[in-house]
Amino acid sequence: MSEQDYAVAWTAAGRRTLARLPEKVATAVVEFLYRSLAASPLRVGKPLKLGLEGLHSARRGDYRVIYRIDDHRRRVDVVAIEHRSDIYRSRQP
């Protein structure tokens, strides 16, 4: 992690969704978070719309990582990690 990287923080919901993932998926997601996402959160993800403003989504295989970027603190808050078919259902307005 370089000085320019963002710190990765976890919300309680983010930790719960990580704990429910299959071990191989969880390992790949954590590696992705602390390398690619921490280095460039705007580049690897896309901003969400329609009631989900302020959140971003990044792909990791069939899973999606939902996160919030805090530029002032140079921090990424992981909100949720779920399968792509389920991730947006519970978050729609």
Locate each region found by the language model.
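Enriched for short, Lys/Arg-rich terminal
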Residues: 1-9, 16, 20, 24-27, ...
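Solvent-exposed, flexible loop/coil residues
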Residues: 12, 52, 56-59, 91-92
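A short, surface-exposed loop/turn module that caps and links secondary-structure elements
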Residues: 34-58
